[in-house]
Amino acid sequence: MAIPRRSLTELDQNAAGAHFLIVEARYYDSIGAMLLAGAKAALERARASHELVSVPGALEIPIAIEIATDQAKRAGAPFAGAVALGCVIRGETYHFEIVAAESARALMQLAVAHKLPLGNGILTVDTEAQAEERADPDRGDKGGDAARAAVALHCLARRAGALS
């Protein structure tokens, strides 16, 4: 099995004082735990804090982000960004394609509509072994990658003066 490629791009990862939302789908619990460990470590390295919300599956992630970010904004403490974590493993039916495409589409629409720095860490794989390799913080670290993407977008928005 090929080792997933790692991004070598150095991006701004100083999010000191920023508070991020992590929404995780724990349908595959052990994979979810690895994704979460990577995301939490990346946010810690960026000196950011986080709040965690868990949902049953990948399709519930976008609406959970919408609800939580709206609530935080109304409370006067908006999130600096969000990290979506989950896993969709191909099965024998068309369900995989629906969940993979619709969760990604909804996340992109949410991020663009609300100018929300968002890292998509929803794995879409053929096998559980592929998911484990990509989720493991010591190998693929896709949870960490998603958090680093959200932090980089937050830093970009901060530099552009686009934060509310």
Swiss-Prot record:
Query: Which superkingdom does the taxonomy of this entry point to?
Result: Bacteria
List, alphabetically, the CDD domains matched. Lumazine_synthase-I
Which EC numbers does the record give? Answer: 2.5.1.78
Q: Which SUPFAM superfamilies match?
A: Lumazine synthase
Q: Catalytic activity, per the record? A: (2S)-2-hydroxy-3-oxobutyl phosphate + 5-amino-6-(D-ribitylamino)uracil = 6,7-dimethyl-8-(1-D-ribityl)lumazine + phosphate + 2 H2O + H(+)
Active site as annotated: H95
Alphabetic keyword roster: Riboflavin biosynthesis, Transferase
Statement: the UniProt record of this protein carries the keyword tRNA-binding: no
Q: Which Pfam families match?
A: DMRL_synthase
* Pathway the protein acts in: Cofactor biosynthesis; riboflavin biosynthesis; riboflavin from 2-hydroxy-3-oxobutyl phosphate and 5-amino-6-(D-ribitylamino)uracil: step 1/2
The signal peptide, as residue positions, is none
Q: Which GO terms describe its molecular function?
A: 6,7-dimethyl-8-ribityllumazine synthase activity
Q: Name one GO cellular component term.
A: riboflavin synthase complex
What InterPro entries would the database entry show?
LS (IPR034964), LS/RS (IPR002180), LS/RS_sf (IPR036467)
Q: Which GO terms describe its biological process?
A: riboflavin biosynthetic process
Task: Report residues binding (2S)-2-hydroxy-3-oxobutyl phosphate.
Answer: E92, T93, R134
Against Gene3D superfamilies, the record matches this protein to: Lumazine/riboflavin synthase
User: At which positions is 5-amino-6-(D-ribitylamino)uracil bound?
Assistant: Y27, A58, L59, E60, C87, V88, I89, N120
Q: Which family does it belong to?
A: Belongs to the DMRL synthase family.
- What function does the entry list? Catalyzes the formation of 6,7-dimethyl-8-ribityllumazine by condensation of 5-amino-6-(D-ribitylamino)uracil with 3,4-dihydroxy-2-butanone 4-phosphate. This is the penultimate step in the biosynthesis of riboflavin.
Q: What's the protein name? A: 6,7-dimethyl-8-ribityllumazine synthase
Organism in which the protein naturally occurs: Methylocella silvestris (strain DSM 15510 / CIP 108128 / LMG 27833 / NCIMB 13906 / BL2)
